């Protein structure tokens, strides 16, 4: 079991997703799988990131709603969540 750690920006991103009317149960389902270290279904399209996000992974909650995270030792680091443009057009 991993211990989740939310970055400050992740908390702000969650609030933004809630305001957009996203179904937060989908995010909680993904987080539960990650915390329990269970394999993710293919539908999440989980993959490693490159460039400035090297060392992190990206999982798709919906086609244009992503979670960026990293597993380090016994910790699940939750970095960002949002759309492709929220996360990569900065």
Language model regions located:
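Nucleotide phosphate-binding site architecture
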Residues: 11, 50, 88
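Short acidic/polar alpha-helix capping motifs at helix-coil junctions
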Residues: 11-12, 29-33
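Enriched for short, Lys/Arg-rich terminal
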Residues: 1, 15-25, 29, 60-66, ...
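A short, surface-exposed loop/turn module that caps and links secondary-structure elements
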Residues: 33-61
């Amino acid at each position: 079991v991993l211990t989740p750690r939310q970055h400050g920006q992740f908390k702000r991103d969650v609030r933004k997703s809630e305001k957009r009317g996203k179904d937060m149960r989908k995010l909680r389902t993904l987080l539960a799988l990650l915390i329990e270290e269970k394999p993710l279904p293919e539908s999440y399209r989980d993959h490693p990131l490159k460039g400035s996000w090297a060392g992190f992974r990206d999982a798709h909650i919906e086609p244009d709603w992503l979670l960026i995270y990293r597993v380090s030792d016994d910790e699940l680091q939750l970095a960002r969540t949002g759309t492709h443009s929220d996360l990569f057009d900065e």
